[in-house]
A protein has these predicted regions:
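N-terminal active-site segment of His-dependent metallophosphoesterases
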Residues: 1-48
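Short, surface-exposed loop/helix-turn segments at secondary-structure junctions
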Residues: 139-148, 172-192
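Binuclear metal-dependent phosphoesterase catalytic core
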Residues: 185-225
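Active-site neighborhood of divalent metal-dependent phosphoester bond hydrolases
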Residues: 44-119, 124-125
Length: 225
């Protein structure tokens, strides 16, 4: 089976519970749509180390990994360093520098090697996996924030599977509080639009409605931890 998770943001415990919930095994494939690091704690590095040791896991680059690499590779670029740390990067920076130099370079080399999109075909159905949204340039593929009316731009029927924008902010960041209030004690769910599916259920954010979402591509079954 083929499973997709987006934006774990350091929540290693939820990640481990998700693997247990879906019964992830050597015969399955896991796709992570970026933003493993930052915000949610030092667990982002633990998730990275786990993914690096799995031959059946594929990770895409997210904007937070891109910010991390720019800040680490350009330590004198105060704008890049500040941008990263303001967006939850300090916890990742601290965790990286608790690794041995060999582990740290191996981890950074892994991040540098990541693709920013991937196309799949399963059982006659086509998917385009990307962190933000399909675009002609790498920056936009990481940073674009489509709204709830977004549609797949592909004429061949590919369904876009993405994250980046928390589902509660699809209608605008100023509407997130209303979205969460309207849940009435419930939890955030995967968003299904017109050929566009968003899996970012707000891991790493400080509110109780958040959870980790996972989508099984064969039948579009949803799993949450």
């Amino acid at each position: 089976m083929h499973y997709v998770i987006a934006d774990p943001h350091g929540e290693y415990d939820r990640y481990r519970r998700m693997l247990d919930l879906i019964g992830f095994s050597a015969g399955d494939t896991l796709y992570i749509l970026g933003d493993v690091v930052d915000r949610g704690g030092i667990g982002g590095i633990d998730i990275l180390l786990d993914l690096m040791d799995r031959s059946n896991a594929v990770m895409l680059l997210g904007n937070h990994e891109a910010m991390c690499l720019k800040a680490i590779d350009q330590p004198d670029n105060q704008r890049a360093v500040s941008h990263w740390t303001r967006n939850g990067g300090q916890v990742t920076r601290d965790a990286l520098f608790h690794l041995t130099s060999e582990e740290r370079e191996r981890t950074l080399d892994f991040l540098r090697s990541l693709p920013d999109h991937l196309d799949l075909e399963l059982n006659g159905r086509r998917f385009h996996l990307v962190h933000g949204f399909p675009a002609d340039n790498p920056h936009d593929r990481l940073w674009l924030r489509p709204g709830p009316d977004a549609e797949s731009p592909f004429e061949d029927g590919r369904t876009v599977i993405a994250g980046h924008t928390p589902v509660c902010e699809l209608w605008g960041a100023d509407q997130a509080a209303r979205y969460l209030r309207d849940l009435e004690g419930g939890h955030i769910r995967i968003f299904h639009g017109h050929g566009y599916v968003n899996l970012d259920c707000s891991c790493g954010y400080p509110f109780p409605q958040r959870r980790m979402a996972c989508l099984r591509l064969e039948d579009m079954a949803e799993f949450y931890t």
